[in-house]
């Protein structure tokens, strides 16, 4: 909405300047896009009259004039404008005047004829008006008057970007109301007296779509002079609001729309057949619009018609066949209320966008129509003359908008604004906004506050938050003190020993893995291949038949993902996933035990393809090394061990190759161990059924078994030398080397700091069915240098324990 500040100040006079006014409007929620002067900077331009006008002796397109500016001497001025003529009242830039662009007027000679000034056009005064010649001022204007003062050009045009909810501000009336509220200033509306009818002519009005048009008013005005020129003050006000002057009738309806906020239309009465009918269009009905384009109407479009044809698209655009022309003498003025829901989107459907549709789409005050009709009639008679008939029309009171009654609680107001505004200020603000306010005094409950009945022009006040917004913006957001919210915060319980899952994810990504996320819903028959003998939870309403069971583990989803990637020529696959498995258990909550699991899978080549590196296929120990890296994050990796699957375990884990798989166990204390996961190569039979291409190794481990870590402790660094002793022991080939290393650590005593397996040998020199394990023993004291007796004692103790538990003997 673009408006003239001087026009606004005719209605309300805030004691602030233009810059402060623009800032105030913006802070109230009506964002100002631009504040621009309505004319350029100029001085020395006066009102003059052409008293002589003749042809230039040496130029066909120039005229020599004498101009009266109310002084003793007439001014000789040469002019080239086509509309320069005898008796014309003009804007004269006298010698010494300065026009926009610092253009100074001096005495000159044009083709030998002296010229003491210049007759100015709109553009030469920096006024944005399309015109072909010089500015024509109203006849009878006082000669010698400053043109800047005459046209009130010490003014600015303020362009406001209105949000969709503030349709009430699409008029000077609405903006004045808003500025008056913000400044506690009175609003002076123009006096609109009812125009007394002088004739009895009326046109019947029938509304067939009362829900779309609850009110329609019409008035006949006869014998008007449609060629009368709009007064300069009206043209200027329209121009400063961004509307071009067309003719007196159109200018008047546009003026009333800008002033009052009520779009209007004028029909040529002689082109109306019978009476006015407000109805929905017939599908395919055609109408030629004022711009000359013929459009085919949709059945959901509201039209104004007579008894034979459509005359206009209601609230959007008029029809050419019923429009006012230079031959028109009798008109029918229209002022109606159209429901926003029946106008919204219709203009866009026809590729139209008009000032009228913009206002009706967002909502027009349903009480304005009668006053707007009288205002338009008043102006039409003043400018064009004519004989006025009484206003007639039709309305459906039941379909007119009803005022909203909204409750505002004191507690809610304070809570949302974060500041307590005095109650008397709240009542004053709502009253100034046009609301009918009642106090609700209920101090014993949280309902104490007010009820407010919204005014007819505010469609957007419907709920409590709307009232709070109004109170806040009128009170002034700048007046609400900055106060940080106070919240009693309690830090989450955090144990430093907790192992974050993100740390494990990052480690696996750093080792070349990609994280996968598979569905928790799986194909039940396929799951039986991986976890036989356990009945999963079957979904009553699955997404599809192959996603009807809750998963019992993560391996099934990862294997399917490997197959998916291998089918897309991925020769190296490394994936991991963390997620829940769902184990039916009667004693658990809802009969279901949910456990967080971590699983991984590798397949294909060990490394990326490279000309200098052999592309070996992955094996069991590649994945075991990655899993050991995860266990090291706990800083307690010695508590974990890998044990070959027993025949019993093989039955429980048919997914794994019987000779290339192990269970993951953790020391549970009191010399007991707990199985927490599995690792191994996928069984060839299962590999075939899944469609895997080549060797695939998987692991799955309970997250609860690795989600804590041993916190580091400061220990003294020994300044005494460390000693290493290597022993080679012969044991049964079936003996687990991990168990033997753990036994060494347990039996080594206080001086043993580490024991590592560094060689395994089977062959010549070792009895069949036996193997030789070479173990490095590290010994050190923090108090003294160890003597041979100390070292020998520890080694002998270890050898004795190995002999007792595993039948081990030192290799010769």
From Swiss-Prot:
It comes from the Bacteria. Its cofactor is Mg(2+). Gene3D superfamilies: 3.30.56.10, Bira Bifunctional Protein, Domain 2, Ferrodoxin-fold anticodon-binding domain, Nucleic acid-binding proteins, Phenylalanyl-trna Synthetase, Chain B, domain 3. GO terms for biological process: phenylalanyl-tRNA aminoacylation. Residues 39-148 form the tRNA-binding domain. Binds 2 magnesium ions per tetramer. It is found in: Cytoplasm. One of its GO terms (molecular function) is magnesium ion binding. It holds the Pfam family tRNA_bind. Keywords: Aminoacyl-tRNA synthetase, ATP-binding, Cytoplasm, Ligase, Magnesium, Metal-binding, Nucleotide-binding, Protein biosynthesis, RNA-binding, tRNA-binding. InterPro entries: aa-tRNA-synth_II/BPL/LPL, B3/B4_tRNA-bd, DNA-bd_dom_put_sf, Fdx_antiC-bd, Fdx_antiC-bd_sf, NA-bd_OB-fold, Phe-tRNA-ligase_IIc_bsu, Phe-tRNA-ligase_IIc_bsu_bact. Residues 401-482 form the B5 domain. GO terms for cellular component: phenylalanine-tRNA ligase complex. Residues 718-811 form the FDX-ACB domain. Mg(2+) binds at residues 460, 466, 469-470. Its EC number is 6.1.1.20. Tetramer of two alpha and two beta subunits. This is Phenylalanine--tRNA ligase beta subunit. It comes from Photobacterium profundum (strain SS9).
């Amino acid at each position: 909405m673009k408006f003239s500040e001087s026009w606004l100040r005719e209605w309300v006079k805030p004691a602030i300047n233009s810059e402060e006014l623009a800032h105030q409007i913006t802070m109230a929620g009506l964002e100002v896009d631009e504040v621009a002067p309505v004319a350029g900077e100029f001085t020395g331009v006066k009102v003059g009259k052409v008293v002589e006008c003749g042809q230039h002796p040496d130029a066909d397109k120039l005229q020599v004039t004498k101009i009266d500016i109310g002084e003793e001497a007439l001014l000789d001025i040469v002019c080239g404008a086509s509309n320069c003529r005898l008796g014309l009242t003009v804007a004269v830039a006298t010698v010494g005047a300065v026009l926009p662009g610092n253009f100074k007027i001096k005495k000159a000679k044009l083709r030998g004829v002296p010229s003491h000034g210049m007759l100015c056009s709109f553009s030469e005064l920096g006024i944005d008006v399309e015109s072909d010649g010089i500015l024509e001022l109203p006849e009878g204007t006082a000669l010698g008057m400053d043109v800047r003062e005459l046209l009130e050009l010490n003014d600015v045009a303020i362009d406001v970007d209105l949000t969709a909810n503030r349709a009430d501000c699409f008029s000077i009336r609405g903006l004045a109301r808003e500025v008056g509220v913000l400044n506690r200033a009175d609003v002076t509306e123009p006096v609109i007296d009812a125009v007394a009818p002088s004739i009895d002519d009326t046109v019947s009005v029938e509304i067939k779509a009362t829900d779309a048009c609850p009110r329609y008013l019409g008035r006949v005005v006869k014998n008007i002079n449609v060629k009368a020129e709009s007064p300069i003050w009206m043209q200027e006000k329209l121009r400063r609001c961004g509307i071009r002057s067309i003719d007196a009738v159109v200018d008047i309806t546009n003026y009333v729309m800008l002033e009052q906020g009520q779009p209007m239309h004028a029909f040529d009465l002689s082109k109306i057949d019978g009476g006015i009918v407000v109805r929905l269009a017939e599908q395919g009905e055609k109408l030629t619009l004022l711009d000359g384009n013929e459009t085919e109407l949709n059945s959901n479009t509201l039209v104004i018609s007579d008894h034979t044809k459509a005359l206009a698209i209601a609230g959007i655009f008029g029809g050419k066949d019923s429009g006012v022309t230079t031959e028109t003498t009798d008109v029918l003025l229209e002022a109606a209320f159209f429901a926003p829901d029946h106008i919204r989107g219709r203009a866009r459907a026809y590729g139209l966008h008009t000032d009228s549709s913009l206002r009706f789409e967002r909502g027009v005050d349903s009480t304005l129509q009668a006053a707007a009709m009288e205002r338009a009639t008043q102006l039409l008679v003043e400018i064009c003359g004519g004989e006025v008939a009484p206003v007639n029309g039709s309305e459906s009171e039941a379909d007119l908008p009803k005022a909203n009654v909204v409750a505002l609680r004191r507690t809610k107001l304070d809570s949302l604004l974060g500041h307590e505004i005095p109650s008397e200020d709240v009542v004053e603000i709502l009253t100034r906004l046009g609301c009918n306010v009642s106090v609700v005094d209920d101090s014993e409950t949280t309902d104490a506050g007010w009820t407010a009945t919204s005014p007819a022009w505010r469609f957007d006040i419907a709920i409590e938050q709307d009232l709070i917004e109004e109170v806040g913006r009128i009170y002034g957001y700048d007046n609400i003190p900055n106060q940080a919210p106070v919240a009693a915060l309690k830090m989450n319980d955090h144990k430093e020993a907790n192992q974050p899952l993100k740390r494990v994810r990052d480690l696996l990504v750093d080792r070349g893995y990609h994280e996968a996320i598979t569905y928790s819903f799986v194909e039940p028959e396929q799951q039986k291949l991986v976890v036989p003998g356990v009945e999963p939870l079957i979904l009553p309403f699955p997404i599809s038949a192959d996603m009807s069971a809750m998963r019992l583990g993560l391996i099934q989803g990862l294997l399917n993902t490997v197959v998916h990637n291998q089918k897309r020529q991925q020769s190296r696959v490394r994936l991991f996933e963390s997620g829940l498995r769902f184990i039916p258990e009667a004693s658990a909550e809802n009969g279901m035990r949910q456990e967080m699991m971590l699983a991984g899978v590798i397949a294909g080549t060990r490394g990326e393809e490279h000309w200098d590196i052999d592309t070996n296929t992955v094996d069991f120990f590649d994945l075991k090394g990655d899993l050991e890296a995860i266990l090291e994050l706990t800083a307690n990796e010695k508590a974990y061990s890998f044990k070959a699957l027993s025949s019993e375990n093989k039955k429980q884990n048919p997914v794994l190759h019987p000779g290339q798989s192990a269970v993951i166990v953790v020391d549970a204390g009191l010399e007991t161990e707990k199985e927490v996961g599995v690792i191994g190569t996928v069984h060839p039979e299962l590999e075939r059924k899944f469609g895997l291409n080549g060797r695939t190794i998987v692991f799955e481990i309970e997250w609860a078994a690795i989600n804590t870590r041993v916190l580091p402790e400061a220990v003294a660094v020994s300044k005494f030398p460390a000693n290493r002793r290597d022993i080679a022991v012969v044991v049964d080939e079936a003996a687990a080397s991990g168990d033997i290393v753990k036994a060494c650590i347990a039996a080594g005593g206080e001086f043993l700091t580490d024991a590592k397996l560094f060689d395994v040998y089977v062959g010549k020199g070792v009895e069949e069915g036996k193997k030789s394990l070479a173990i490095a023993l590290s010994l050190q004291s923090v108090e003294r240098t160890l003597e041979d007796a100390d070292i020998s004692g520890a080694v002998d103790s270890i050898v004795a324990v190995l002999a007792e538990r595993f039948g081990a003997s030192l290799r010769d």
